[in-house]
């Protein structure tokens, strides 16, 4: 659960709706296993304010400042995925690739 704080110090729940597409979780129809993960990442579209995740982040930062921070590392991702034994190596590898790429892309958000 994430929250946002406004200028008056009041908190509201962060509008995070669906992280499924962000992790290419529909492996049957939209994001089949075996296809290039980076190519598939380019096809993902947000479904809220804008279809572009970066545009949504830019708007949020413009309105509220840079309040989104990551408190995890690639090592944390790797350790968590090592424990996710219920998923195939292919699925875990895909999630690892996606999260590592996003950590690199949004390095300025890391705490």
Label each residue range with its predicted role:
Residues 2-111:
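Anionic ligand-binding catalytic core segments
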